Amino acid sequence: MFNKFNTKPLWEVSKTLSSVAQGFEPADMVIINSRLINVCTREVIENTDVAISCGRIALVGDAKHCIGESTEVIDAKGQYIAPGFLDGHIHVESSMLSVSEYARSVVPHGTVGIYMDPHEICNVLGLNGVRYMIEDGKGTPLKNMVTTPSCVPAVPGFEDTGAAVGPEDVRETMKWDEIVGLGEMMNFPGILYSTDHAHGVVGETLKASKTVTGHYSLPETGKGLNGYIASGVRCCHESTRAEDALAKMRLGMYAMFREGSAWHDLKEVSKAITENKVDSRFAVLISDDTHPHTLLKDGHLDHIIKRAIEEGIEPLTAIQMVTINCAQCFQMDHELGSITPGKCADIVLIEDLKDVKITKVIIDGNLVAKDGVLTTSIAKYDYPEDAMHSMHIKDKITPASFNIMAQNKEKVTTRVIEIIPERVGTYERHIELNVKDDKVQCDPSKDVLKAVVFERHHETGKAGYGFVKGFGIKRGAMAATVAHDAHNLLVIGTNDEDMALAANTLIECGGGMVAVQDGKVLGLVPLPIAGLMSNKPLEEMAEMVEKLDSAWKEIGCDIVSPFMTMALIPLACLPELRLTNRGLVDCNKFEFVSLFIEE
């Protein structure tokens, strides 16, 4: 729970807070004439004051006696006040922004703290990458609570990453002050099949009395889900059906309702609350992955609260889901999540609950944003050289690098990955493709494109070959180093020449995302920090991503956030079929499968 303010622990300031509450000492700040959203009792308390001292709340109620000559008084003028919003599961890397720029982007929207899982940068740079992001966040007002990446690689043995994290590494990071728990345990097969590695990293977290966050994407909610939760996992953001979320809540697991740039699960999973008469204390709203144009256009948790209200969740319940519920999930409600005495003075002023319009944001008793604009400074952080040079490809990539051979054949029946727009899953399809000069041809008329994943961390020269369906592209290619979770170089296209151009464009700029057609680069987003992030401002990044979106449309793709859907093609912990730099993976059986179906 670190930021630029370094608020003192409660035990250091308890005497002062008690004195301020009784009027023996003046408060540093007092908010008057507010309508308090009390998340402890789910009610609005009219005409309430809040006295703040030493970055913490001293009193809630009538605070006239707490005002002295030097007290800063903020007149809420009848506006609502709520605890500052907490995002319980977020990959900052998905915003393509540095941590400091991410903070500048979300704090004015009422976000005061995030539970960051930096497993993207960890897959590239190891724990050094985690350290870099922690240091980047220390110069911001945003509270950066960090979880140690649990699955680096995501599924051991199926891909090549830049680093690996084991139980010994987790044990060491649990000593870091900034670490509050374990990042999403995606290797649920390892938990269910009792592997030493999976249970080892969970065990080291439990020994430290910290929170284990989860990732259980199976539709099975019986013995498998029970076994997963029994291992110590406390929450999960992978519910895509209402029954999934409800089953988790009934078993005492915090169900995190996701609404990001590409994954719009809230419409369905909100029914777990709206269609069932259940307590919502085990429900949390999170963003998971949010892109720069979404942050600029829609906002952050303020937008997600609004979406929850639109889906029928009561406004006060929605606010509980980004405040006290989240804090309790991470066993931090003694510090965060409510406007009550002793807690950190993280408060948002809301003009109305329907539109969730944030007018002021206070963090640790400091006014940090007003009317959508940050009012405090943020220190710039320069990422070290190893973070800025992460493209290590062994062989020069040419059109011939994309050949998929099938000798003495005219046609082959091929396993094809079919994407599901706006969903994380894929389908395995079997499609007959033509062979010309012993080379298997993609078939844009059937919406079947060629896909190749090149290892980019250790110059191993390994590459996985396959085909994908569902993007709708008739001509051109796209490439990305944002390719979960190993973040190798993923290239998809209709022809080898454009695919080579796309790959080499990213190698030259240090990583990123690109779309090309007929030998021309139509859209490019350079991401020089680990091939994942940029140090450019939000507005500039949003413009580049918007241009890339337009480039995707120009080459024939109309799905929402196509680069995010593309980025999940190598993620071998999600069903059904995936492609890593080692080959095709059946993610139901967790085994490699051949590209061709033998007759």
Swiss-Prot record:
User: What lineage is this protein's organism placed in?
Assistant: Bacteria, Bacillati, Bacillota, Clostridia, Eubacteriales
Under what name is this protein listed? Adenine deaminase
Q: Which family would the database say this protein is a member of?
A: Belongs to the metallo-dependent hydrolases superfamily. Adenine deaminase family.
Disulfide-bonded cysteine pairs: these are none
UniProt gene name: ade
Q: Which GO terms describe its biological process?
A: adenine catabolic process
Q: Which Gene3D superfamilies match?
A: Metal-dependent hydrolases, Urease, subunit C, domain 1
Q: What class of enzyme is it?
A: hydrolase
Species name: Clostridium botulinum (strain 657 / Type Ba4)
Q: Which cofactor does it need?
A: Mn(2+)
